[in-house]
Amino acid sequence: MKLTCVVIVAVLLLTACQLITADDSRGTQKHRSLRSTTKVSKATDCIEAGNYCGPTVMKICCGFCSPYSKICMNYPKN
């Protein structure tokens, strides 16, 4: 019973620490370019929308490859 209580308290404490750190670190990322998807997609040679993207193609799609038609498609706009 004591071990169960200790485990529950430890989990709650670690969860609280995670939430506190997540709130404090918003907007303070030092190297934003490392996580930028636009720079990665510009630097990567990719297949444009409307072209074949099956298993024999060595490049990746700029958007996503449709699993049924094997045609590259752009991501839908939100």
Curated annotation (Swiss-Prot):
<keyword id="KW-0528">Neurotoxin</keyword>
<keyword id="KW-0800">Toxin</keyword>
<feature type="disulfide bond">
    <location>
        <begin position="61"/>
        <end position="72"/>
    </location>
</feature>
<keyword id="KW-0732">Signal</keyword>
<keyword id="KW-1218">Voltage-gated calcium channel impairing toxin</keyword>
<dbReference type="Pfam" id="PF02950">
    <property type="entry name" value="Conotoxin"/>
</dbReference>
<keyword id="KW-1015">Disulfide bond</keyword>
<keyword id="KW-0964">Secreted</keyword>
<dbReference type="InterPro" id="IPR004214">
    <property type="entry name" value="Conotoxin"/>
</dbReference>
<feature type="disulfide bond">
    <location>
        <begin position="46"/>
        <end position="62"/>
    </location>
</feature>
<keyword id="KW-0872">Ion channel impairing toxin</keyword>
<feature type="propeptide">
    <location>
        <begin position="23"/>
        <end position="42"/>
    </location>
</feature>
<dbReference type="InterPro" id="IPR012321">
    <property type="entry name" value="Conotoxin_omega-typ_CS"/>
</dbReference>
<keyword id="KW-0108">Calcium channel impairing toxin</keyword>
<comment type="function">
    <text>Omega-conotoxins act at presynaptic membranes, they bind and block voltage-gated calcium channels (Cav).</text>
</comment>
<dbReference type="GO" id="GO:0044231">
    <property type="term" value="C:host cell presynaptic membrane"/>
</dbReference>
<dbReference type="GO" id="GO:0005246">
    <property type="term" value="F:calcium channel regulator activity"/>
</dbReference>
<dbReference type="GO" id="GO:0005576">
    <property type="term" value="C:extracellular region"/>
</dbReference>
<dbReference type="GO" id="GO:0090729">
    <property type="term" value="F:toxin activity"/>
</dbReference>
<keyword id="KW-0960">Knottin</keyword>
<keyword id="KW-0638">Presynaptic neurotoxin</keyword>
<comment type="similarity">
    <text>Belongs to the conotoxin O1 superfamily.</text>
</comment>
<dbReference type="GO" id="GO:0008200">
    <property type="term" value="F:ion channel inhibitor activity"/>
</dbReference>
<protein>
    <recommendedName>
        <fullName>Omega-conotoxin-like 12</fullName>
    </recommendedName>
</protein>
<feature type="signal peptide">
    <location>
        <begin position="1"/>
        <end position="22"/>
    </location>
</feature>
<feature type="disulfide bond">
    <location>
        <begin position="53"/>
        <end position="65"/>
    </location>
</feature>
